[in-house]
Structure formats: C-alpha cells, structure tokens
Amino acid sequence: MTEEIKFSVLVSLFNWIQKSKTSSQKRSKFRKFLDTYCKPSDYFVAVRLIIPSLDRERGSYGLKESVLATCLIDALGISRDAPDAVRLLNWRKGGTAKAGANAGNFSLIAAEVLQRRQGMASGGLTIKELNDLLDRLASSENRAEKTLVLSTLIQKTNAQEMKWVIRIILKDLKLGMSEKSIFQEFHPDAEDLFNVTCDLKLVCEKLRDRHQRHKRQDIEVGKAVRPQLAMRIGDVNAAWKKLHGKDVVAECKFDGDRIQIHKNGTDIHYFSRNFLDHSEYAHAMSDLIVQNILVDKCILDGEMLVWDTSLNRFAEFGSNQEIAKAAREGLDSHKQLCYVAFDVLYVGDTSVIHQSLKERHELLKKVVKPLKGRLEVLVPEGGLNVHRPSGEPSWSIVVHAAADVERFFKETVENRDEGIVLKDLESKWEPGDRSGKWMKLKPEYIRAGADLDVLIIGGYYGSGRRGGEVAQFLVALADRAEANVYPRRFMSFCRVGTGLSDDELNTVVSKLKPYFRKNEHPKKAPPSFYQVTNHSKERPDVWIDSPEKSIILSITSDIRTIRSEVFVAPYSLRFPRIDKVRYDKPWHECLDVQAFVELVNSSNGTTQKQKESESTQDNPKVNKSSKRGEKKNVSLVPSQFIQTDVSDIKGKTSIFSNMIFYFVNVPRSHSLETFHKMVVENGGKFSMNLNNSVTHCIAAESSGIKYQAAKRQRDVIHFSWVLDCCSRNKMLPLLPKYFLHLTDASRTKLQDDIDEFSDSYYWDLDLEGLKQVLSNAKQSEDSKSIDYYKKKLCPEKRWSCLLSCCVYFYPYSQTLSTEEEALLGIMAKRLMLEVLMAGGKVSNNLAHASHLVVLAMAEEPLDFTLVSKSFSEMEKRLLLKKRLHVVSSHWLEESLQREEKLCEDVYTLRPKYMEESDTEESDKSEHDTTEVASQGSAQTKEPASSKIAITSSRGRSNTRAVKRGRSSTNSLQRVQRRRGKQPSKISGDETEESDASEEKVSTRLSDIAEETDSFGEAQRNSSRGKCAKRGKSRVGQTQRVQRSRRGKKAAKIGGDESDENDELDGNNNVSADAEEGNAAGRSVENEETREPDIAKYTESQQRDNTVAVEEALQDSRNAKTEMDMKEKLQIHEDPLQAMLMKMFPIPSQKTTETSNRTTGEYRKANVSGECESSEKRKLDAETDNTSVNAGAESDVVPPLVKKKKVSYRDVAGELLKDW
C-alpha cells in the first residue's frame, strides 16, 4: 500500500529531483518512484504531496510564512525573544548573525532551527499519517489547534523531513520541475484531463495505466475548467501580423475577477482561474443568475466587476470582496456586483467549446437576458454596447485593419480601462491554452506612462535568490517647500523593485547600505523627515537615515493611478517599475506631491504623456536600446501654474460676484476646467492656490493633502453646492448638508440658525432637505417607549390592536401544488404587512414570538403534529409552552377585521391533551415539591378591610432564610437540574424570560391573588374559547401550592400562573393575604419559602380545609404511585423548613417513607412531629400561642406517617416580628 510508505522515501525523491540538473533526469526519477513504491490504486495519496498547489480535496491551511513562524515558535515552546525565534520571525532579513546564507528561504531557516531540537533520526512518519495530519491542520479553526498539529509533526519527523513538510504547507516545493512535466510523465493524457476537470484525484484514479490512452473528456457543469488565456503582445502592429487575414474581434479587457459561472438548475458555482469556488458572490448574484440565464444547465466565462450606479460606470478594481460582503450583510450602497459574460462553454446538455467564437457569441445572446449594471453580455453587436453611456467608446467591435485596433486601443486607454484583447472569431475554446488565438495589449507593455522622479526612503529584504539583501525600495514624493528652500518632508508613495538588473540593484544597495537604519517599529518611530502611514504593507525593513544620503529613481508604471490607502500620497501607481537610477540628480529635485496630483488631474486620473512618438510603438526595440542614452523629452510642469483659459467664456449670471473659489479636489464626473468655467460664467473668480483672497474652498471628498491643508484655514464646501446654484441660477444658502468641514467659529455661528436635526429656522425645506433632516433624527430602540407613543399617538384600534403581539408565520404546505404555494406566499406577505400596520411585530425567531400563525389554504385541514415536525427539538419545546399561542390564520384575519385582539383559545391548533400534558407536568412537579402543612384547607375569601399594608423593607431574601435554616434528615426533595447559575425550575410552565424581570409590590399582590391553583383536575379552568379575566376570584378553589423563591424573586404560585408573575420584585416578599379581595385558596407548605398568612381564621375553617386538602392529596398519591420510580433523589434543604425547625426544637422526628413521582417531578419527604417554642430563639409572647394540630392522613402505597397540623397564623406573626 502506498499509504504505508514512509515519508522519508518521498523526502529522498524530493532531494534527488532537486539535485538533478536536467529535466529528463528529474522526470525519470519521478517515474521510478511511481513504478517502485506506488500502486496504481493509490497514486493520489503521493501525487497530492508532490504537487500540493493543485490539490483541492484539502482546504486551505491559512498559514503563510509569518503565521507559520509564530506557530512553530509556540510548538517548539521557545520564547519570542530567543535568537531562534527572532530568526524565524525575521526570515527575510540578512546578516550572518541572524539569518545567514539562507536568508529569504523560510523552510531552510526553519530546518536550521529545528535541527538543534529534532536531530537526524527519522520519526517513522508514513504518507498516510502525514495526509491525516495535514487534513487536521486544514480543518483547524484557530492558531492553538494548528500549533498542536505542528507539534505532532515535529515529534514524528526529523529536521530534513520537516523542511519538506513546511514546503508542502506553503504549497511551494521548489523542485525545479513544472506541473506540466509531472503530468506528462504520469500519463500522456493527464494534463488534458486536468484542464477540463481541475480534479487531481480524478486524474489519478482514471489514468492508472500509463500505456492505455484515455478518450478525451469534455467539460462538465459543476467541475471547474482551466480558462483559455491570452498571449501577451507589446505592439499593435505585431499583434495584427499574427492575426492578419482572419476575422478579429477587439474587446475591452476588464479589470476584475475572471470567473466561470456554472449553473445547474438553482445550483450556482463561481470558479476562479485557480479553480476555487468563490461562494461569497452567491448572496448578491445567484438569484439574478437563475432568473436571467434561460437554460437549466450552462457554463459562462466572464469577468466579475463592480458597477457604480451614481457614476453610471464600472468602478476601479479591488472592491469586489467588499461589495460582496456588503450585499451579504444587507448594507445599502451605490455600488453593486456586475457579471460581464464574454463567452459560453456549455448550453443545455452539450459542450459548445468546439464551436467557433462567432457561433458561441450568437448562443450567448440567446442564453443570457442582459440586465443593466448587474448581468451584461460582451459581444460586437448588442449586449453591453447598448448600455454604454453616451459619448463613451464601444466595449467590443469587429476590426478590419491595424488602424482600427490602434484607434480602439487609444479610446480604451483614455477611458482608464485595463487594455484590450484581440480574438480570432473562428477559434475554438481551448482549456488552459495560451497559443495566440487570443492576444492582450495593455498600456504598460508599450510604455505609455510618464517617468516620475522619486526618492528612496526605505528598503525591503528579498526572498529566494535575493534573500538576505534589500531587493525592493519604498519611495516617496516631496512635500513642496517654500521658494529657494529644500523640502523637509517626504511622503511615502509606492513600493518598487523590478526593472533593474542584478548588477544595477547591487550597486544601488551598496551605495545606500552605510545609511541603512533598522526599522524597530513600534519601539522607535520612523525618521522625522518621512511621513508614513505605518500600514503593514508599507512598513520597510530598513530606513534611509537621512534624505540627503539617498538616491533618486526614475520610475514608470501603468498609466492608471489608484487611490492609496497604504501610502500617504493621495495616489499610488499600478505595477511600478524602475526605469533608471538618476545619479545625476540631487535628492531635493525629486517630484513633489502637489505636482504629481496636478499631473493626475490634468490627465483624467492617469500618468499618460501628452504626446507619444509614433515610432515608440512602431519600433519598440529601438526605443528600448536607446532609452538610457537619450534624455526623455518629457515636461512635468505643475498644472497649478497654468491658468485655465477662460478668455472665450461669456457671463450668464452674477450669482458668484465678489467670490473667489479654490477647488481642493473635484469629482471624476467633472474636470477642474469645467468648474473654473462654471464659476466665471456666473460672475465669480477662481484661484489656483489657497491664499488669503479665497472666499470659498470647494471639494468633492474629505481626503488628500490639499484637503488637510484647506480645513486648517477655513470651511470646506461640497461641490454639489456650486452645481445646485448654477442649475437654479440663484445663490442658495449654505445649509449643513453642503459642508464637508466646519471651523469652530462657523460651527458656533451655525448653531444659532439650525436646530439639533440641522433644520434651519429661516429656510423652508424641500423634499431632499426633509429626507436629510429625518435621517439625522435618532430612532428610539426602547420597545416600551415605542409602544407607549404608538398608543398615545395612534389611539385608533386598527393601528394598535396587535401592539403586544409578535407573530411567527408558518406556511402549512404539506400537499400543495406550486401555484397554491405561490398563493400562500402572497397571503403571508399581506398578513405580515397588516400585522405591522396593526402595531404588531413579525419575527423569524420562534423564541421571540408570542403567536405562531399557521397559514394554509381554506380547504386544507391543519395537523399540529405535522406542524411540529418541521421544527427542531428546542423549538418543539417552545410549541408546548402556554405563552406561545399556536393558532390558525383565522384568528389573525378576524382580529384584524374586528380591529381588536381576539381570544386565542377558540382558534388554537395545539391539541388539548398536549397543552394539558405540559401544564400537568408542572402540576405534578409542584404537587411533589409540596409537603402538606397541618393547616391546608382552602380558605375563604377575606374581606377587603383585612388588607394589611406591608412595606418592601420587610421582605427577606432567600439567602437569609437559608442561613437561618437547620438541616434535617427528612428534608429530601426532588429537584430539577440547574442550568448554569440559574435556579432550578419548579413548574413546567415557567419560562426563561420570567426569571429576569421585576415589578412593583402592588403588581405582585394583585397577580398572586388572581393566579391561584387547585389540585383537582375538575377545578382547573381549561374551558376552550374563554379567557380567564384577571382580577376575579375563582369558585371552588382548593389548596394553593407555593413555589420556592429564587434569589430575591417572588415565588411562583401555581402551574397555571401567568408568566407575568415571574416578574415580581423579590425584595417585596410580603404576605399574599395582604391583597384586597384575593385571599382565597391559600395554604402553607413545610418545605417551600412563603410568607405566612396574617389574617385570622376560625378553627372550624381550618378543619374543613385540612380534610379537603388531604383527600385531594390521598387521591393523587394513589393514582400515581406506580409511575414514580424513575428519577434520582437530590437532598436539598428547604429554607423555610430549616428556619422553622430552628425556631421550634423537635423532641422526636418520625421518618416517613418517600414516594417516587413521575419523571421530571420532585420527591418530597413528609415531616412529622410537634413544633414547640424554642428557648434559643427567645420568641415573643405570640410564639407561645402557636397551635399544633393533629397529624395528616398517611399514604396507602407507600404508607405515609401521619403528621400533625401546625397553624401558621401565630408563626407568621413571629416571623414578621423579627422583620
């Protein structure tokens, strides 16, 4: 088995291949390894380690050199300050004391560090074990897990083996053998099969026999295909010579992500050129793709771009991921993803790559339905050309001569696009082909950019061949100084390293090396001469100690500039290259930032030269050979010294009279000259510099050096104010919406003219102004405040009848057709809107809902069991909660029709037995946690005059009761498991929400009286369709069960008690009998913490109550004894019982047998004995009057010991007296 091969064998193969000089030797050793050690059925386990960059079965490791160095340091257990740790972290840097000869090669430096800790003996790691560990490494979600895997690898390998493991992780073995050579040696058809499947495992499994040719496989939907590529060409004439005599189409080369879209029904994949599936595009694009691609199966080849709706054009490259993330998070933006399809590879069930490009263009127009700004088609006739803005060039044309190509290329470059692609219309689509059927022409290939003189201020160490020495430079532009003064500040501009030969680079480095200063960020700041961002991508390894010691470089780039976030300069360059080293130029003559910005603005955001010699493109070789000997005839005159020519401008109005404008920056949609002419047309003047005569500073955005300078001196106004004034031909007031920056003086003055929402006291609002004011008003997030104002401001019932409802909609579509499901969806949308209009809320979270409304067609029967099957186990438990009403849509329809919230019981879908089982479980639990007191009969209703006012200061916390309690052997109690730090639940109807709220004592007193319980099933108010009204006493009430307190919260009184009773303030624990007119149904339990009754009752009432309660308890015990053997006991000391036992010493206690209850209930111990006065407690005279009654009846099975009745009337007085 290949899996059992030691990894050391594969390491030997790597070493042999790396040492071999010729390609044939490398290939023969690879072939010998396969024939000797590998079985055909197990090729993949070894090949995936030889070319790891093509293995897509294993996910990304998420480890580059810097992170991998940190993980290795942790895995080895060495300090970050140790020399070996510093070498790993600074692997790029040179110096024999640190990195040595291996500087720039991370795997070799890691091997040196590991060699002193691992030794040379192999750990016996097999290929299978290595693959398993690499799978674990790829699936690890945090650095700690990755470190653990690396530690295991270190234990099972030696330093030489670990070096190759690190290279496999970095997916760069540096064997000097291309994947093309490996495929050719593995099987003659391997490369072709991989190009159409991008599946290395499939290649290894299908091509086991090297001598058996494989039938050429066509592309399939769902499997990535290597894209056809364009050959680079540097000259229009050279490109035309290769395509002469053929039908050629010229297309704009878009600057985006090359993406293949695979559609199979509703299953959409977005494969990149590296055959990675970019699922991040799915949220923004998948629905659009499904609706606008008119076939079920299809493969499109195209470019994913960003469309700017405000500018009506494509945005600059680099924001795809940002826009995809914004769409995924539901953020509004004026930018959106747009896919431009320029080829189709698969239609229906057939591959069309063998058809000509012209035929594929016709298919593309039939298959894709274009949607402006979202899904476009790039074809010569129609498609994207139809949607282009007026005045802009076409995106795709058929060319017939080199002049047509030249003209199209210039138009594309002026439009700031990436370049053009020339395609043979008769060519077929070839996966991975770069033979010249497609050719690309980009501006940097023909030196269309201007040469810029910049100053070196820092350096970066290289890797690989240039490891250990500075190979790239950080260059800067000067901040313009005053006349006849050298610049004192330099702003970071870009990073450049290509363009020089090794000798030229070594010469520059040797001249600067004496002035290198190590960058010790963050310990030491950069030299004060340099203005930098300290961005990680900007931060150099070394600084140039002083600008006077530095050298000027002449650099060129793509003609397009990009707005910089990494560097201080407002613009940076794309693909910069060093043209030559300017030893002849002193350091202070480098280009300044202001001149560069004006150059960019004057050339519409590019660095294009004003006039390019035609011979440059006709004969690029001559230009290249003579570029160093001849001085370029390029003039970079700062445009701020050149006034806009306004001699032919005629005045239209005088709205800007006596005003002088200075434009800090302008939008891309307008040029600086346009604004200058606009100001002059309306009677104003403009200045090219910011001086004291300027009255208005205008800007398009709050960024850039010029903006920072302007805002230090005066207010900065948005350019839209100028446009609005000109469009309306009148001077508009400077409202807050027009300001980009306000000085302190202007801000103070403006506060007298506007309110807190920026609404002016003196000017009327238009529609746009009203929208702005409303957007400035903060929205309240307090739901209670919102409900209060809704009731106050919308007193009509139709706007507030569902104010307290939160509705969760469930579509019941068990046997519906597609059309009926669509109608059900429309019904759901209508009801959602009506709920919102009626003041209710709609939620997608069942835990937040108060009503689950089941939507169904009129004739469809509803089944609660089928409804519950659609939910998770946690949600099923919520469905049984009484607080959640499961109703049909008729309840909602009729409530909306009558403009009032109807009782839910009539419309409930939850079967009564399910609802009762939920409440019944609560009753059983409470029944078992209740030990019947000697006085337990149902009490008659107290008159209103018996209400006793007790302040909240008398309330005792549960903690205090526990401290005063005394442990007892009879106080066995069955309790539910606690969840975290939450108290155990006593009743099944109790909810999590009830544990978190508190209310005033008056609310608690009224709620306790209203929610009394009864033990008898016949006495439970469960009639359907009638809602019990709060505030009314119930008829035929029996003993009341009171639950133990939780912390400072009031105890819950019964299983049917509403959830509102859980929200009582625990500090106000007063007697429930103190309520007005709600004293019925009270009893006291030995184990529960409750306040004693204060009202006095006659002895005859007590005897009647005792008989009734004991009869109910006896019947309940006899009926449930056989089911009560399922749960374990947990000994729990009841606070009130312990307190009573401490107050009344018991001469003798009789242990009672406990009876097991049904699952989920509590076990209770019956306590017998007499309660006498305690000498230790020194009670007052009322304690001596405590009555001791006869014992209770005993249970039948198991027998219960009779217990004596204890009157708690006097005990209550004693307890309250202590308080």
From Swiss-Prot:
Ranges of compositional bias, category Basic and acidic residues: 1084-1096, 1117-1126
Keyword ATP-binding tagged: yes
UniProt feature, compositional bias: Basic residues: 1042-1051
Subcellular location: Nucleus
Residue ranges occupied by any BRCT domain in the UniProt entry: 651-739, 807-909
Induction: Induced by gamma radiation and by white light, but not by UV-B. Regulated by ATM in response to DNA double strand breaks (DSBs).
Location of the active site: K253
Compositionally biased tracts (Polar residues): 932-960, 1148-1159
Family annotation (PROSITE patterns): BRCT (PS50172), DNA_LIGASE_A1 (PS00697), DNA_LIGASE_A2 (PS00333), DNA_LIGASE_A3 (PS50160)
Residues involved in Mg(2+) 2 binding: E418
Role: DNA ligase involved in DNA non-homologous end joining (NHEJ); required for double-strand break (DSB) repair. May be involved for T-DNA integration even if not absolutely required. Seems to be dispensable under normal growth conditions.
Family: Belongs to the ATP-dependent DNA ligase family.
UniProt protein name: DNA ligase 4
Organism: Arabidopsis thaliana (Mouse-ear cress)
Gene, per the UniProt record: LIG4
